[in-house]
Amino acid sequence: MRKLLCAGVAGALMLAGCVGTPTSLDGSTGAPSFGALQEMCGSPVDYGPDALAVYSTFFDAYVALKRNGLSKERFCGFQAAIAQRHTAYATNPGPQTQSAWANFLLDQRAQALSWRAAVDPTLRAG
């Protein structure tokens, strides 16, 4: 089960690299830093070793926000929900909560990619 989760996270990260997601928390040309994305909605949260995966998720939602496919309220609510789940995981780490956190984050990543794909022609087939 643990190998399957790791494979899923690795697959999501590889996919993130293919769709133009920054590979550093510092951002890049046209991509705000992870801290800047978090500050759009409040105080930054320390995601520890999950920071890059969370950043990829936030960045895809940010692209949808910038292209008018997502409201700022929904973007900030999305960030808040992820922060809340991460806090619950960090408060009580263990195999079950790690699995629940990984599954939740993968679901959120898929949602963010869906929002981005709706407004970003580089993610559409064809």
Residue spans of the language-model regions?
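Bacterial N-terminal signal peptides that target proteins for export
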Residues: 1-8
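C-terminal motif of bacterial Sec signal peptides marking the signal peptidase cleavage site
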Residues: 14-17
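Bacterial signal peptide processing site
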Residues: 19-22
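Post-signal peptide N-terminal segment of mature Sec-exported envelope proteins
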Residues: 26-52
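Soluble non-cytosolic domains of exported or imported proteins
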Residues: 31, 48-56, 69-76
